[in-house]
Amino acid sequence: MWNELKSAKEINKEKPFYINILAKDVFEIDTDETILVQGIIDLYYINKNNELILVDFKTDYIKEGEEDKLVKKYNKQLEIYKKALESSLKRKVVHTYIFSMQLNKLIEL
């Protein structure tokens, strides 16, 4: 990832966002109501191939081989980030990653 960032066309860090989404997409409830979600996207960039890449940094303590625990824990959060980014930029996120600080490893969702 670091090498790809060096040649990126555009890099954005710690960007706040707001998005209206269905409450049932966040909580296990049966409703068609929408809620306003706000957050901060750690990193997104446009690589040299003009692809939109989303990265979220996590500091959770996990052991090598337990990467799936991070994916399970944060998948819903990153889906919301992805929707927010795609909605605001009007383009598709090609890759979504968690960067585990503990493992110093990029994990694709």
Model-derived features: where do they sit?
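Structural signature of nuclease core domains in nucleic-acid processing machines
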Residues: 1-109
